[in-house]
Design a protein with these regions (language model features):
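Membrane-spanning beta-strand positions in outer-membrane beta-barrel proteins
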Residues: 2-4, 54-56, 107-109, 146, ...
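Gram-negative outer-membrane beta-barrel transporters
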Residues: 61-63, 79-82, 86-152
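Transmembrane beta-strands of outer-membrane beta-barrel pores
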Residues: 5-11, 21, 50-52, 59-65, ...
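Outer-membrane beta-barrel translocator domains and adjoining extracellular loop/strand segments
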Residues: 13-22, 26-30, 61, 65-74, ...
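Residues on the lipid-exposed face of transmembrane beta-strands in outer-membrane beta-barrel proteins
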Residues: 1, 5, 44-50, 95-101, ...
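C-terminal beta-signal and adjacent terminal beta-strands/loops
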Residues: 178-210
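Outer-membrane beta-barrel signature, preferentially recognizing the C-terminal barrel domain
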Residues: 9-63, 82-93
């Protein structure tokens, strides 16, 4: 079992501090914020192992966290401003567990996790938790051949000031060593059933955008 603590400072970049507006697209401008302050970040972590079971827990507290999102551009309703702001306080918690075992040629690892941020911004709460689960399978075949099949799931959740959509994905890979391990042949398929999407629903004040 191990317990860790980390303190760090995240400073805004010159581009984020620059008091100017730059063109991104017909509907998005990037706007600097010279009033940004450095963020102070405290992290606490715990890792414990019980045989083949591994458990992890993390907590984070931050003052003046730097967060980039979309906001209405003053006097132009049809244009969004991509801007970095300071959140006065930011807190998050996460817990996870992983268990791996071997059954003949099959070597699966099952993982599950929970994470939640706690953000209040302009009267709204952005604290919908994220649940993740995965089953990572490896099958060892003769003649240095390996088959991998990973099944991944994540729930609808808040990510900063955004809503991340529910996701499900299956990835497969076949790997074979050739010429006495001098060469390696890999055949892989990502998102086998075409179910994955990285779309986010961005909601800041009165702005809703894909």
């Amino acid at each position: 079992m191990s317990l860790s603590y980390d303190y760090s400072v995240a400073r805004p970049t010159y581009r984020q501090l620059n008091n100017s507006t730059s063109f991104v697209s017909d509907y998005v401008y990037e706007v600097g914020n010279p009033l940004l302050r450095s963020a102070n970040i405290h992290k606490l972590g715990l890792v414990a192992s019980f045989g083949k079971l591994k458990i992890m827990a993390n907590g984070r507290f931050s003052r003046n966290r730097l967060l980039t999102s979309y906001f209405p551009l003053e006097q132009v309703d049809s244009v969004l401003a991509l801007r970095t702001i300071n959140l006065h306080t930011y807190k998050s918690l996460s817990f996870g567990a992983a268990y791996g075992f071997q059954l003949g040629a099959w070597r699966p690892t099952v993982e599950a996790s929970y994470s939640q941020q706690f953000i209040t911004f302009q009267g709204g709460k952005f604290d919908k938790p994220l649940y993740k689960a995965s089953v990572k399978n490896m099958v060892v075949l003769p003649k240095d051949t390996y088959v991998f099949c990973n099944i991944l799931y994540s729930s609808l959740a808040h990510d900063g000031l955004n809503n991340s959509h529910q996701q499900f994905r299956v990835d497969m890979n076949i790997s074979k060593a050739l010429a006495k391990n001098k060469w390696n042949l890999n055949l892989s398929v990502t998102d086998l059933f075409n179910t994955y999407s990285n779309r986010k629903w961005m909601q800041t004040a009165d702005v809703l955008s894909w």
